[in-house]
Amino acid sequence: AALIGPNGVGKSTFLKTALGDLPPLSGEVKIGASVKIGYFAQAHELLNPNNSIIDEITRVKPMLPAEARNFLGSFLFSGDDVFRPIETLSGGERGRVALAKLALSGANLLLLDEPSNHLDIDSQEILQNVLAGFGGTILLVSHDRYLIDALATQIWAASPGKLEVFEGT
């Protein structure tokens, strides 16, 4: 599903509440015992700026360096690029690292906050391919109509005090 609406209506706050990072205004949030959440943060604050790209990946799933380098190649990182510190990466490169980590996480529910922001065309294509091949549930906050049209089976349109649900593609 895609959660859409104007800035400031609470889309990102909703995701953070579902994650347990923020308390609900009322009631409680219950997540099923078998649900494993993967989260793509809009500002990529879940990346350690001091780690290299390869370190970020192997902390999610231990693997041999050659295997990690091969995996990172599918996210457009090649050669010695894999040893670059996160703090030196562009916003789009950080987005690709965050997406690579999600792909390895074993999550069956992805909460994605503006995942196509700061991504170039090649990175947007990788994002769409990874998400299209994902076997679990995706809740996507986005203003990217192309991504929403490609992936969302439902559209949740938020406005102040109101949520409407529509069929997607």
Predicted stretch roles:
Residues 1-169:
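ABC ATP-binding cassette signature C-motif
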